[in-house]
């Protein structure tokens, strides 16, 4: 009976352990990486990349979406990178996704290569399930999620775009299908539900974005 109580107490302790967060330099400075307490290098684990909106940061995005707080419950690895800071003006952080959003100053920034480098590095250091690599992006991060998935459909299994949008230009279908969830408020005045433009560069609406990917 004492042994039973000891094992039960040990299991309860292990299950209540918090996820572990560490910083890793993926080439542009340190980035928070959350590792669930139940991570086992012998088992494949899903990976989520959380992409912030224009002017925000990875840590700030996670602070109100709370992905790191549920990493243990759903057993996934989480990376919350921060984009490039503008060199003048607002000096806001951004992802170079499409012509509409949101690279207004630094045309040479290659966020596709940077983010894919993060995914590849994570695969080298952890046992990542290659069939469960996901992107979650808010606003500008949603734009970036669409673009990363389009350019790397063999790697990205699914994306969630929160008030983001896909590309407005006509393109061939990506090589592989990608699951898409678009969440968008109809009263959004920044990235409009029905679509619009930013500094003269068009972006599709929420319905058009998901219809585009459904046709792919």
For the regions a protein language model found, what residue spans apply to each?
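Boundary at the C-terminal end of the N-terminal hydrophobic targeting segment
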Residues: 19-21
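Short beta-strand/loop motif that positions the catalytic acidic residue
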Residues: 182-184, 188
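Bacterial N-terminal signal peptides that target proteins for export
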Residues: 1-7
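Conserved alpha/beta-hydrolase "acid-adjacent" motif
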Residues: 190-194, 198-205
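Primarily recognizes the serine-hydrolase "nucleophile elbow" in alpha/beta-hydrolase
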Residues: 123-178, 189
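Acidic, glycine-rich loop-and-strand cores that form catalytic or ligand-binding grooves
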Residues: 201-216
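Serine-hydrolase catalytic machinery in alpha/beta-hydrolase-like enzymes
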Residues: 24-134, 144-147, 151
